Amino acid sequence: ESYYNFQQKKIAYLSLPKRYGGAKYPKVHIVDMLANQAETGKFDQVISGLLQEKIEEKLNKKEQIILIQNRRGFSPTVRCKECGSLMMCNQCKIALTFHKNKNKLICHFCSFYLNNEHLLCQECKGLELNFSGTGTQKVEQLINQTFPKSKICRLDMDTSKSSFNIASILKSFSNQEFDILIGTQMVAKGLDFPNATLVGIINADLGLYIPDFRATERVFQLIYQASGRSGRSSKEGEVVIQTYSPNSPVIENAKNLDINKFYEKELLERAELNYPPYSWLAKVEFIGPNKFKVYSLIEEVKHNLKDRYIGLDILGPAPCFLEKLKNKYRYQLVFKSKKSYDPNGSLLHAFIRKNFKIYENKKPLGQNRINIYFDPISLL
């Protein structure tokens, strides 16, 4: 949206065409993980041969490495081998994540957990469970096994319960007390480690296919920013991007560090689908403990909407991406108001105010509630 506003001459575009101190841009390598796994026959391979080779090379030079996997825990999914069911949170419609250090399956959205000892399938009571997927804890274990002499630290929400912990880990890595820093997106932005000459992005596709119009922007931003952590001094840096979608324009533009080309393509897609910056958005969430009552409410509200106008699109009703959280069901309506008809968003604001004013008194809602978001960051 900011790039579009620059094009419309509403704001100035200040850029840094060169890296500070004359540092060179890193050399970027793309690893096609499907081809890599087919070649090696290891279809559960997490660290590609190229990334392993580059890590060893940097360790031999006494240089540091940053590895990014934007998913914490050990295994994001635990599945029964007998019936195929996923181990799910009983309060949220979310798969439980296995945390090996705690030996627990934990929901990242509420306080629910299951101890791994004597764990049975929730559906068929089967004993055989398969722990699949990769989180930061698994990456840490694999790197420990492959490079046992290296000193490794990990930075994610599990190791950084306070700002003191975060500062302590980053300071130790900056002082070269550790060789390898493994983390989530927390380590991708705004950090300066002159001796870090390799950044490895374990799974660059995470988040790429989430049903949100800003998903590709977030993935591009993560890769672009993470690449900027490598080679920030006189030492040349390298970046290894592991992906299952090597031909994706997002991956290609990130590889070439071509931010303007990415912006231009993204704007074309946003214009075609009438998303910001070409429209104003409002998201209205309907939340309650009874799924059928929540859906009945949202259907009734949509049916009774008054004073619709030209340029207004209404999406839904539809389940939110996270349909059930903390024993509450979540549905949403999304309102898109074209800026060509509604230049300052006043039509959309007036429409929402008029149609939802009745619900300011919560009595008609009972146990349900309605949340209204103008210009939401995400539609998830």
Predicted regions and their residues:
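Inter-lobe coupling/hinge segments of SF2-like helicase ATPases
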Residues: 1-285, 290-295, 321, 332-333, ...
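Short beta-strand elements
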Residues: 153, 308-320, 364-375
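Short amphipathic alpha-helix segments
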Residues: 259-260, 293-315
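Short, conserved charged micro-motifs
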Residues: 291-297, 340-354
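A common structural junction motif
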Residues: 302-311, 350-366
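Short proline/glycine-enriched turn/loop segments at secondary-structure junctions
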Residues: 321-324, 360-361
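C-terminal effector/interaction modules appended to NTPase cores
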Residues: 326-328, 364
